[in-house]
């Protein structure tokens, strides 16, 4: 088994006295990540519509890219020849690549699952692709992100117990193969993923097995695949405290205000979600916990900033009326400006929670967001 790298450490700086929340610093070869922290998603080595310089201005520290999509286009060989994904996309900060498992398992009509891995047809050109734990790690080693994810089987949110039990057991066996295949433990941290669906005993069993492997970090997967918010919350509140306190904890695919606040309450450190850019591309702004449709006529003659408290380029430069005009005109700039703001908004939200944890006022300051979902 590859030895954990000294290049990756997690230091807890403060703990909330009324919850499991903690503020810390996750050190990587490309710099520190102050936690808790929201990570923007750059699926194809680009956060949609945003330049790396603009992304840095949002205070983003760590960015996620997608192994499955980059394998299909342009291919890991081209990215490796460029010097790795950081140089390829012009981003100098920490990066994480997911394993491609979630995307592969979403191709329900195009794939075949076996103990070796998943055989699927590329939705781009129809060619057969054999994605195994070894191949996923090989691709991620070539991409060169700081954090890489184990190849896992992500069962449907409402899958029956036998299906989830089998998927969870296979995820562990695949993790062991990922560890053996990992060629760059010195500069890439391999995180394991706790699966188990909505069955808390399976989550406990999976967490116990992963902890025994002493990995550099741990993720909770399978919580953004169609479950009700209350079920997601139940799983996170149960699972997060089981994970080692001296390692970073990552909740995959979650990025709403309440879900992040509740997860931080349980001890989660890192989040990723496509919400900021997806909403931006549909003319929706995230403003202090609310969703605003900038196409609405109410903004047509509103010359105030989108959010007077926000330091982002959009809010410091343009009015609601201008944004309304851009969205109504279907101008690309409108979608870009809203995406910039939305990314900044969710990063600021996790930054403000971090500061509240340092001040030990988290449960008071964010009580509104800590009510369990129904």
From Swiss-Prot:
Its EC number is 2.4.2.29. Zn(2+) binds at residues 310, 312, 315, 341. It comes from the Bacteria. Residues 253-259, 277-281 are annotated as: RNA binding. The active site is at 98 (proton acceptor), 272 (nucleophile). Substrate binds at residues 98-102, 152, 195, 222. Pathway: tRNA modification; tRNA-queuosine biosynthesis. Binds 1 zinc ion per subunit. Belongs to the queuine tRNA-ribosyltransferase family. This is Queuine tRNA-ribosyltransferase. It comes from Synechocystis sp. (strain ATCC 27184 / PCC 6803 / Kazusa). The lineage of its organism: Bacteria, Bacillati, Cyanobacteriota, Cyanophyceae, Synechococcales.
